[in-house]
Swiss-Prot record:
Lineage of source species: Eukaryota, Viridiplantae, Streptophyta, Embryophyta, Tracheophyta
Keywords: Coiled coil, Stress response
Induction notes from the record: In seedling roots and seedling leaves, induced by salt stress. In seedling roots induced by abscisic acid (ABA). Induced by cold stress.
Residue spans of biased composition, Polar residues class: 145-156
Compositional bias of kind Basic and acidic residues: 13-23, 30-42, 53-81, 88-97, 105-114, 172-183
Protein name (Swiss-Prot/TrEMBL): Late embryogenesis abundant protein 19
Signal sequence region: none
Residue numbers spanned by region Disordered: 1-158, 172-200
GO biological process: positive regulation of response to water deprivation
Tissue specificity: Expressed in the shoot apex and leaves.
Ranges in a coiled coil: 52-81
Length: 200
């Protein structure tokens, strides 16, 4: 029995030794693999970091180049806009000068024409006023002359009639009634003559 137990113990020890050996091999292999994996990971990380740095630098350079291009484009656009605006201002100023010159010339012509028209109208008005004044004076003179002549004729006629009546009365002094009638007729004739002269 003891041998059976010794055998079992021997086998158990042998199995344990095999197991420990196997475990040691597995552990060593695992350690090697872990170390190798760690090295690879570290290398990959370093490579990635280097690549990342390179990418970062490249991105930075590209961004700088894009910024410079954008700045150049903006400056060119600004210059072009400024040039266009200046050209527009120059054109507007030139157009304004031309328009101002044209309007000034037209205004001067209009002023001159208005002055000529006003002068002609003033001259015509003065001529018309002078003609009217002359006509009025001539009419007044003519009317006064006609009235004076008529008045003198009436007076002459009245005097002549009076003399004739007096002469007639002087011949027939004894007819007193006729004398009164003749005086009345002479007065009536003189009054009628004065009324006629006033109407003219």
């Amino acid at each position: 029995m003891a041998s059976h137990q010794d055998q079992a113990s021997y086998r158990a020890g042998e199995t344990k030794a095999h197991t420990e050996e196997k475990a040691g091999q597995v552990m060593g292999a695992s350690k090697d693999k872990a170390s190798e994996a760690k090295d690879r990971a570290s290398e990959a990380a370093g490579h990635a970091a280097g690549k990342g740095q390179d990418t970062k630098e490249a991105t930075k350079e590209k961004a700088q180049a894009a910024k410079e291009r954008a700045s150049e484009t903006a400056q060119a656009a600004k210059d072009k806009t400024s040039g266009t605006a200046q050209a527009a201002r120059d054109k507007a100023a030139e157009s304004k000068d031309q328009t101002g010159g044209f309007l000034g010339e037209k205004t001067e012509q209009a002023k001159q024409k208005a002055a000529e028209t006003a002068g002609a109208a003033k001259q015509k008005t003065a001529e018309t006023a002078q003609y009217t004044k002359d006509s009025a004076i001539a009419g007044k003179d003519k009317t006064g002359s006609v009235l004076q002549q008529a008045s003198e004729q009436v007076k002459s006629t009245v005097v002549g009639a009076k003399d004739a009546v007096m002469s007639t009365l002087g011949m027939t002094e004894d007819k007193a009634g006729t004398d009164d009638g003749a005086n009345k007729d002479t007065s009536a004739t003189a009054a009628a003559t004065e009324t006629t002269a006033r109407d003219h």
